[in-house]
A protein has these predicted regions:
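A conserved structural motif in NAD(P)-dependent oxidoreductases
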Residues: 109-120
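Catalytic Tyr-X3-Lys loop
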Residues: 2-19, 37, 54, 61, ...
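Short, small/polar-rich loop/turn modules that mediate ligand/substrate recognition or access, typified
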Residues: 73, 78, 135-137
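A short, exposed helix-loop element centered on a Lys and neighboring polar residues
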Residues: 21-22, 66
Length: 149
């Protein structure tokens, strides 16, 4: 794998998370509250998958989330990550190998199903609400049991 191919997802993920968080934090600091929400992969690299820099990018986002939570917490800003383990609805119909990917996502879960976009939205709404006001510097595992924390 070429270096450029490996580092592309790492640079894109960290840069996007940093720039978006910085822009949001400027407003949130003024109001004394807010929630920055990231999306990422989960756990350790998956044997048998050759994802190049993608898993490294997920781990970098996880580290950045913890760092931002430490820096922004004193301003009343919470930072959380949603970890899904894959949402089959987001894989385009007709994508080469889609069926095998979806089957594998579901096979890895304890519940025999994968998270849906509705599931992700419901967890995101909760995480952004005052009901989750004690949660920061953490990842919310919505992998249907594919990842054991």
């Amino acid at each position: 794998m070429a270096l450029e191919d490996f580092e592309r997802p790492v640079i894109a993920a960290v840069r996007t998370m940093f720039l978006t968080s910085r822009a949001a934090a400027r407003h949130m600091i003024r109001q004394g509250s807010g929630v920055i929400m990231a999306f990422g992969g989960y756990g350790d690299p998956i044997p048998g998958y050759y994802l190049g820099g993608l898993q490294v990018a997920f781990q970098a986002i996880d580290a950045l989330r913890r760092n931002l939570a430490c820096e922004l917490g004193p301003h009343g800003i919470r930072v959380v990550t949603l970890q899904t383990g894959g949402v089959p609805e987001t894989i385009p119909e007709g994508f080469d190998g889609r069926e095998a990917i979806v089957d594998d996502i579901v096979r890895r879960t304890m519940l025999g199903r994968a998270a849906t976009l509705d599931d992700v939205g419901n967890v995101a709404a909760f995480a952004a609400s005052d009901r989750a006001r004690t949660m920061t510097a953490t990842a919310l595992n919505i992998t249907c049991g594919a990842q054991v924390d």
